[in-house]
């Protein structure tokens, strides 16, 4: 190819890329302009009332259809199925009664609670030099909230000498409204579900976690006070709904969003925020590295019902034009203040990347893969000084506790391939993070620990065990881990497996991985795919740990599946839209919505349908046996039943009947064959049709009796196979 051809092709690709970005931005703008609350199919927003009028905990309940247990089509006998309550991260975005206006931001849910504690002050203006510079730039006005918007708030800070963290309050024995909110939210109203089938569950294995106790406000306070859980809520983010991260609570999932220098816009990031909460993101990290980081973050925070995290070193690096060697503590400190006053709820700080650890990575296959870790490693080597995040860590803590910003101690030495897993550099940093968490606790700063990464399955538990030992049970927050490196494009699978395992062992929050991991910046659909994969992993871990009520949704869906309640199957799932679409690909007819089979096995080989028929056959024999028993009591004689010998009277008769019924329930192969032959005859007698008109339903019920006297049971207008 000539240089001219190469240049032309490059120009064409660039034009196409710009066109695609314009289209994406326009679509995101349209999404924001028309944004209305959106609920999942057949779901309702539910609010549980706390101890005070302004403490209403939002969640979702999935409504179910009735189960038909007999009767005629025109007058069926039904069994009511209860609504299933589920955790909801979407805040007002899933409430049809909410008035959504992205340009006004969300309601300040927690502001009254913050004000009444009387330990904060409203600042006259921001104290960050960078923020003041941005506000003076009129050229950025088009990126800001309009003057007078309710989204604009003046920043708050702790009064001199005060600490305003949830950890500080917990250690004082104070149960805050945030703690009560969390307790109600974690219980999810599952105590109201009394159905025996829905509450079935196996014995969990919690690996030392305190699972099974009622989640009371006092339990939440105690976990926070011990440092085993956090409630990441900046006093400047009153829009956020309280949630907790800790291994004795439900496993949480974080979603990453953020623009870069080459793609995405503010509109797209706000769209991804709303999209993330719809699909279950418990927290969102804004990892923006491109232009307008400050303005993008402002729009995200003011419209976020979930905690927002950042990696401040990314923006600090932008301020020194991307040259790591030019970073200073002063630039970084101003960045912390800027973000804390905006309302960032937790900072990822790579303070454990020490100068002496950098040479430990020299023989790694993939070296240092953490972006923040590599930035600090380069700074340490270029200055041949200790990491300034480590040497200034106490100052970082003093700043964080003034806004209740939680710390997420970053794993800058995490392995980037399974070949590097559990090596010296990784565990050396982990020990340092344990040292730092104890310093943070001296200042009442809520803290979690970040973890790997790429770890083969057999080495995962060692990571959890060492973290608990070195970090005094501070919550663990991991990226996966990815358990194999052979599947680019499918790393939400390879990491989801590891995520489920480490969450079962005790990890408190999982950072999602999308199909674009290692390949590019995720779009909306990638975000959804990553979240669904990780919600599966988190939920599977909750079940394995033995969380009370965690399995209720599974049992409800299984019951719906067995009863061929197709709509309930879709709606009880994590992604109703996809489930419905997959079913309709092969069976699009409306009649298929009530069919007692799917396209996998077809009408003649559905195991669940066959099982139902066998149950009906056994039930008919049981009914006949009971009738004979009653007749025997009246006439003084007992009609023969199978091979059961006739007995004279009373309890002896009933015990023999029970023994025979137990035998029927077990079923020999011959009896199963006979039962299927009978159903085959019934099917043929009805004209071998899969579906019967509604006006023929009664006629079907009156079908001629077969040799054994069993009647055709027609639970629906769909003919039994």
Swiss-Prot record:
Keywords: 4Fe-4S, Iron, Iron-sulfur, Lyase, Metal-binding, S-adenosyl-L-methionine, Thiamine biosynthesis, Zinc. Pathway: Cofactor biosynthesis; thiamine diphosphate biosynthesis. Its cofactor is [4Fe-4S] cluster. It is an enzyme of class 4 (lyase). It catalyses: 5-amino-1-(5-phospho-beta-D-ribosyl)imidazole + S-adenosyl-L-methionine = 4-amino-2-methyl-5-(phosphooxymethyl)pyrimidine + CO + 5'-deoxyadenosine + formate + L-methionine + 3 H(+). Zn(2+) binds at residues 454, 518. Its EC number is 4.1.99.17. [4Fe-4S] cluster binds at residues 598, 601, 606. Substrate binds at residues 256, 285, 314, 350, 370-372, 411-414, 450, 477. Signal peptide: none annotated. It holds the Pfam family ThiC_Rad_SAM. One of its GO terms (cellular component) is cytosol. Binds 1 [4Fe-4S] cluster per subunit. The cluster is coordinated with 3 cysteines and an exchangeable S-adenosyl-L-methionine. One of its GO terms (biological process) is thiamine biosynthetic process. GO terms for molecular function: 4 iron, 4 sulfur cluster binding; carbon-carbon lyase activity; zinc ion binding. Catalyzes the synthesis of the hydroxymethylpyrimidine phosphate (HMP-P) moiety of thiamine from aminoimidazole ribotide (AIR) in a radical S-adenosyl-L-methionine (SAM)-dependent reaction. Homodimer. PANTHER family: PHOSPHOMETHYLPYRIMIDINE SYNTHASE, CHLOROPLASTIC, THIAMINE BIOSYNTHESIS PROTEIN THIC. Belongs to the ThiC family. This is Phosphomethylpyrimidine synthase. It comes from Shewanella oneidensis (strain ATCC 700550 / JCM 31522 / CIP 106686 / LMG 19005 / NCIMB 14063 / MR-1). The lineage of its organism: Bacteria, Pseudomonadati, Pseudomonadota, Gammaproteobacteria, Alteromonadales.
């Amino acid at each position: 190819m000539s240089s001219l051809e190469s240049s032309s092709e490059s120009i064409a690709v660039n034009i196409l890329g710009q066109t695609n970005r314009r289209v994406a931005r326009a679509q995101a703008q349209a999404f924001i302009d028309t944004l209305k609350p959106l609920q999942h199919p057949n779901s309702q927003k539910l609010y549980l009332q706390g101890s005070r009028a302004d403490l209403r905990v939002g969640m979702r309940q999935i409504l179910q259809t009735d189960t038909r247990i007999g009767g005629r089509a025109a007058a069926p006998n039904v069994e009511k199925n209860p609504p299933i309550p589920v955790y909801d991260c979407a805040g007002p975005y899933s409430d049809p009664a909410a008035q959504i206006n992205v340009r006004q931001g969300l309601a300040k849910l927690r502001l009254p609670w913050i004000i009444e504690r009387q330990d904060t002050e409203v600042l006259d203006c921001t104290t960050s030099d960078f923020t003041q510079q941005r506000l003076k730039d009129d050229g950025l006005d088009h990126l800001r909230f309009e003057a007078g918007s309710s989204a604009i708030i003046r920043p708050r800070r702790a009064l001199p000498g005060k600490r305003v963290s949830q950890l500080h309050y917990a250690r004082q024995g104070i149960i805050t409204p945030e703690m009560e909110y969390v307790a109600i939210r974690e219980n999810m109203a599952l105590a109201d579900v009394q159905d025996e089938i829905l509450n079935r569950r196996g014995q969990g294995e919690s690996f030392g976690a305190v699972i099974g106790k009622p989640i009371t406000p006092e339990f939440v306070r105690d976990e926070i006070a011990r440092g085993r859980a956090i409630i990441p809520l900046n006093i400047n983010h009153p829009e956020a709904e309280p949630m907790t991260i800790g291994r004795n609570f439900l496993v949480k999932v974080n979603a990453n969003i953020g623009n870069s220098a080459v793609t995405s816009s503010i509109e797209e990031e706000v769209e991804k925020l709303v999209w993330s909460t719809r699909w279950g993101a418990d927290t969102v990290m804004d990892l923006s590295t491109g232009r307008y980081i400050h303005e993008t973050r402002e729009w995200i925070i003011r419209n976020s019902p979930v905690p927002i995290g950042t990696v401040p070193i990314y923006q600090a690096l932008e301020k020194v034009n991307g040259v790591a060697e030019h970073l200073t503590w002063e630039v970084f400190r101003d960045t912390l203040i800027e973000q804390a006053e905006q309302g960032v709820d937790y900072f990822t700080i790579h303070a454990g990347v020490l100068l002496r650890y950098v040479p430990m990575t020299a023989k790694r296959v993939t070296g240092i893969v953490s972006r923040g870790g590599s930035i600090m490693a380069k700074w340490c080597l270029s200055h041949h000084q200790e990491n300034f995040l480590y040497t200034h860590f106490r100052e970082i803590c003093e700043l964080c506790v003034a806004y209740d910003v939680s710390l997420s101690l970053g794993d800058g030495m995490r392995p980037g391939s399974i070949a590097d897993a559990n090596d010296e550099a990784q565990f050396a940093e982990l020990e340092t993070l344990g040292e730092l968490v104890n310093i943070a606790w001296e200042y009442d700063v809520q803290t979690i620990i970040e973890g790997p990464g790429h770890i083969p399955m057999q080495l995962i538990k060692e990571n959890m065990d060492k973290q608990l030992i070195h970090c005094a049970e501070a919550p663990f927050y991991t990226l996966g881990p990815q358990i194999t490196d052979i599947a680019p494009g499918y790393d939400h699978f390879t990491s989801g497996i590891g995520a489920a395992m480490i969450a079962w062992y005790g990890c408190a929050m999982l950072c999602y991985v999308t199909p674009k991991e290692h390949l590019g910046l995720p779009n909306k659909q990638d975000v959804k795919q990553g979240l669904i994969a990780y919600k599966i992993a988190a939920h599977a871990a909750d079940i394995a740990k033995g969380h009370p009520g965690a399995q209720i949704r599974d049992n409800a869906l299984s019951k719906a599946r067995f009863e061929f309640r197709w709509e309930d199957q879709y709606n009880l799932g994590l992604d109703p839209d996809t489930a419905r679409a997959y079913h309709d690909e092969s069976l699009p007819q409306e009649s298929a919505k009530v069919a007692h089979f799917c396209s996998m096995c077809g009408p003649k080989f559905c195991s669940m349908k066959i099982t139902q028929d066998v149950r009906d056959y056994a039930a008919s024999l049981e009914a006949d046996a009971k009738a004979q028993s009653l007749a025997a009591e009246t006439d003084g004689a007992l009609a023969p039943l199978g091979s059961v010998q006739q007995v004279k009277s009373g309890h002896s008769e009933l015990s023999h009947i029970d023994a025979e019924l137990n035998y029927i329930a077990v079923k020999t192969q011959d009896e199963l064959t006979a039962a299927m032959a009978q159903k085959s005859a019934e099917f043929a007698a009805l004209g071998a049709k899969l579906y019967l008109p509604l006006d023929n339903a009664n006629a079907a019920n009156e079908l001629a009796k077969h040799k054994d006297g069993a009647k055709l049971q027609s639970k629906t207008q769909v003919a039994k196979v």
